[in-house]
Curated annotation (Swiss-Prot):
It comes from Aeromonas hydrophila subsp. hydrophila (strain ATCC 7966 / DSM 30187 / BCRC 13018 / CCUG 14551 / JCM 1027 / KCTC 2358 / NCIMB 9240 / NCTC 8049). The keyword Disulfide bond does not apply. ATP binds at residues 8-15. Keywords: ATP-binding, GTP-binding, Nucleotide-binding. It comes from the Bacteria. This is Nucleotide-binding protein AHA_3920.
Length: 288
């Protein structure tokens, strides 16, 4: 049976994630007390082959060590194919979402302000965050974007196969929190300053032609390829499910997009399971 444990700070998108997983055929249980997880697996494994469980900060055991031990036991005992997703967003975004929804934070009942509750939740969820197979930062995601991202991550993964995600972004919007590696392309020649190239993106042929003619750009790409090709086998042997490679330039329109596309193409040719995401190409969609 496949098991996905969904966790994350309140307001980061867990409810959306569970709804998407239900649409994908998962039997979903919301806010399950963690100590009941082994019993739940036993009770439903004969009826369902896909199970998703959402863990809320209110349902954690008192001891972080007990939480880590229990999840490690479920992961290692071999009854299920275990994956864990952790959803998060910047503090300012969570504050904004709570202000707009007028909902009460789960920890606000403990006489904490909203800001204090968010910081306390960060501490309590640290064991889940640090051991997650996939971390998704929803700060700049619309509900549609988040739904599509979850579908891609779940459906695009074959059993025991590492998924290599290339993610372009603009530093002006912040570094993606889900990136395992981040490469800074801001020192490379910038098509933004060439009037006839400025309106295009790194996916368009005029920009691609210009950047591919720049020796520094191509050497940068080659060196990233070589580094990843060297260390991916070690990550695969370490049972990693996902490796996310962030490529950043100033605005996330030209250089980072081109480089991410080139790297994705190169590793597809090597037979890797590759996914690509351009975080800031279209920031006009309604945000989550």
């Amino acid at each position: 049976m496949q098991l996905i444990v969904v966790s994350g700070r309140s307001g980061s998108g867990k409810t959306v994630a569970l709804r998407v997983l239900e649409d994908l055929g998962y039997y979903c249980v919301d806010n399950l007390p963690v100590n009941l997880l082994p019993q739940l697996i036993v009770s439903v494994e004969s009826q369902y082959d896909k199970l998703a469980v959402s863990i809320d900060v209110r349902n954690l055991p008192a001891s972080p060590d007990k939480l880590e031990t229990l999840l490690a036991q479920v992961r290692n005992e071999g009854r299920v194919e275990f994956s864990s997703f952790f959803f998060d967003a910047e503090n300012s975004t969570l504050l904004k979402r709570y202000g707009e929804s007028r909902r009460l934070h789960p920890l606000s009942r403990n006489q904490l302000s909203l800001d204090e509750a968010i910081r306390e939740e960060t501490h309590l969820l640290a064991p889940l965050s640090s051991t997650a197979d996939l971390r998704i930062d929803t700060t700049n995601l619309s509900i549609h974007d988040l739904s599509e991202l979850i579908k891609t991550r779940v459906l695009g993964k074959k059993e025991n196969e590492l998924v290599l995600v290339f993610e372009s972004f603009g530093f002006k919007y912040g570094i993606p929190k889900d990136a395992d590696f981040v490469f800074d392309a801001r020192f490379l020649p910038n098509p933004h300053w060439i009037p006839e190239l400025k309106p295009f993106t790194g996916k368009d042929e005029p920009v691609a032609r210009y950047l591919s003619s720049q020796p520094d750009v191509m050497q940068f790409i080659l060196q990233i390829e070589n580094m990843l090709a060297t260390w991916l086998p070690h990550l695969e042997r370490n049972n990693r499910s996902y490796v996310t490679v962030g490529i950043g330039c100033t605005g996330g329109q030209h250089r980072s997009v081109f480089i991410a596309e080139q790297l994705a193409g190169a590793f597809r040719l090597l037979g890797k399971n590759v996914q690509i995401r351009h975080r800031t190409l279209d920031k006009s969609a309604p945000q989550f």
